[in-house]
Amino acid sequence: MAKIYSPSFPGTLCLCIFTLLTLMFIRVSARPATFVEDFKAAWSESHIRQMEDGKAIQLVLDQSTGCGFASKRKYLFGRVSMKIKLIPGDSAGTVTAFYMNSDTATVRDELDFEFLGNRSGQPYSVQTNIFAHGKGDREQRVNLWFDPSMDYHTYTILWSHKHIVFYVDDVPIREYKNNEAKNIAYPTSQPMGVYSTLWEADDWATRGGLEKIDWSKAPFYAYYKDFDIEGCPVPGPTFCPSNPHNWWEGYAYQSLNAVEARRYRWVRVNHMVYDYCTDRSRFPVPPPECRA
């Protein structure tokens, strides 16, 4: 016979209250994020301008400084996304970044989108990189198949126990699988914050540093809106990272589905311009994750 809730079952009462509070806590972490509630200026607050009552922002880069913002909390697994409209026209030498970072110095975990500025008429490149336990050097570059300065596009990082996927709109441009069983580093234990920055990097960003920033075109602007964070906030429920009921840990998200796999192959065949796995000048022997 099923138990009926009543004060005569104190253990059940405690469990019900705990479960309710936990679900409320997780629900809050999954609501649409806003800049005012969920983010703060990381540097040069004067160059971060709020719009639409904090639902959208503008980052500014000029000769004096760039700027950046960070989430107020850190998360352990989940999905983060933003809609971004990049710098139009001549943006050579600039980098607009959207990334997650554990902020743990030499052992940091980090998942990077870096949008590399261009000379007018050239395609915009996006570089992704993955740091696990302090080790990076996993760069891949893709030329975007549209002009990302004309309108907002959604950029997403999915981070689960099984894999990390970078999406441009609904198109996966990179997948990094968890191969810890083969002694390949994978970020599993360090919570990460969500960050974005706009800065000058003309020593490497555009054509390896050949194209320098043209300050006569400054100030440069990047725009953000529709912030979305669905993850396990830290501090938070201790069971959250391993909870199989979190949707990003569900069976449907343990690998790319058939449609995503086709789109991923299309990107790699038609738009990938650099892959560290095939760069024999840097890695005469491919890194272990490239052979897994």
Curated annotation (Swiss-Prot):
Q: What is its main location?
A: secreted
Q: What class of enzyme is it?
A: transferase
Classification via PROSITE patterns: GH16_1 (PS01034), GH16_2 (PS51762)
Q: How is it modified after translation?
A: Contains at least one intrachain disulfide bond essential for its enzymatic activity.
In this chain the GH16 domain maps to 31-224
Reactions mediated catalytically: breaks a beta-(1->4) bond in the backbone of a xyloglucan and transfers the xyloglucanyl segment on to O-4 of the non-reducing terminal glucose residue of an acceptor, which can be a xyloglucan or an oligosaccharide of xyloglucan
What's one GO MF term for it? hydrolase activity, hydrolyzing O-glycosyl compounds
Q: Which residues form the signal peptide?
A: 1-30
**Cellular localization per UniProt:** Secreted, Cell wall; Secreted, Extracellular space, Apoplast
Q: Where is this site: Important for catalytic activity?
A: D112
Q: What is its EC number?
A: 2.4.1.207
GO biological process terms held by the UniProt record? cell wall biogenesis; cell wall organization; response to water deprivation; xyloglucan metabolic process
**Which pairs of Cys residues are joined through disulfide bonds in the record?**
C232-C240, C277-C290
Mention any one GO cellular component term assigned to this protein in its UniProt record: apoplast
InterPro entries named in the record: Beta-glucanase/XTH (IPR044791), ConA-like_dom_sf (IPR013320), GH16 (IPR000757), GH16_AS (IPR008263), XET_C (IPR010713), XTH (IPR016455)
According to its UniProt record, which residues of this chain constitute the active site? E110 (nucleophile), E114 (proton donor)
Q: Which UniProt keywords apply?
A: Apoplast, Cell wall, Cell wall biogenesis/degradation, Disulfide bond, Glycoprotein, Glycosidase, Hydrolase, Secreted, Signal, Transferase
- Glycosylated residues, per the record, are N118
Domain of life where this protein originates? Eukaryota
User: In which residues is xyloglucan bound?
Assistant: E114, Q127, T128, N129, D137, R138, E139, D203, W204, G208, R282
**Pfam families registered for this protein in UniProt:** Glyco_hydro_16, XET_C
- Provide the family line: Belongs to the glycosyl hydrolase 16 family. XTH group 1 subfamily.
| Task of the protein | Catalyzes xyloglucan endohydrolysis (XEH) and/or endotransglycosylation (XET). Cleaves and religates xyloglucan polymers, an essential constituent of the primary cell wall, and thereby participates in cell wall construction of growing tissues.
PANTHER family documented for this protein: XYLOGLUCAN ENDOTRANSGLUCOSYLASE/HYDROLASE PROTEIN 8-RELATED
Name of this protein = Probable xyloglucan endotransglucosylase/hydrolase protein 6
| The organism of origin for this protein | Arabidopsis thaliana (Mouse-ear cress)
Lineage of origin: Eukaryota, Viridiplantae, Streptophyta, Embryophyta, Tracheophyta
